[in-house]
Amino acid sequence: FVAGFIGSPQMNFLDATVKVNGKDVTLQVGNYSLKLPENKAKALIDGGYDGKTVVMGIRPEDVTDDATAFPESTVEAKINVYELLGAEVFLYFDVEGFNMTARVDPHTTSRTGDTVKFGLDMTKVHVFDKETELTITN
């Protein structure tokens, strides 16, 4: 968990429910099902996390406003703040009550007030045990 607070902006954290279907594992964040890659899925299956709530962490650079980049793991949200910082753009938005930040291409056309489908790179996601705060997979 501590690693999530290193860097600026810090990692996005969302509570998620683990859903196992054979070898497939999704993290359910409200109405969104985010499919985990096989290596990360195995850690959750082996740990007996089916049906349990975990904490999903994803860094802002692993969230894009190009949903086609990660079609199996998208969330839709209204942009609350657009922040241009030199060669970087940060987009701030809420997903199912959780604050999120995306660091996106500075040429983005996304702006404050726009509703955007964001793609999450699930190969880069970190999953933590909600009770012990220990890393399950990263």
For the regions a protein language model found, what residue spans apply to each?
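Internal alpha/beta loop-helix hairpins
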Residues: 1-32
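Short aromatic-glycine-enriched beta-strand elements
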Residues: 23-26, 86-92
